[in-house]
């Protein structure tokens, strides 16, 4: 019940989500207890609040490409606002983080990526160095129009208040982009 699920034991759990009047299909979640590695490789995420109408937003995209040239441990996601790629999740994130201007990018949800982003690549890269005591792995299988995910977490310490956010992204969308920088 409620908007979260906490497994208190190992086993299989049948769950579904509902938001009146919609109800999802039921899925099965397997919870198992395995030994975690002694350390996990740190990763980072850049959440880019953007839109095709935003003429200054290519600056952040360029910054992301510079980060990707330096490391494969930083991932990015575009949360589109005000264009055909906008969805309710992008709006929920925008509202939760109080985004009012574009572009805005967050690194690991803990800090706004400093302007000008292409000159502050180290801010993102440095968040993805070293080891962590919490880890995550995701495997996926695409079968026609159905995607199956295997999500595993590992904890080498007790951590409270953790949340797991999973994005399923579509890549390679071609659209016209306003650009005031070139």
Label each PLM-derived region with a short phrase.
Residues 23-25, 40, 158-162:
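Short loop/turn segments at connectors of secondary-structure elements within structured domains
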Residues 27, 44, 164:
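A broad, low-specificity signal marking well-ordered, structured residues that form hydrophobic/aromatic
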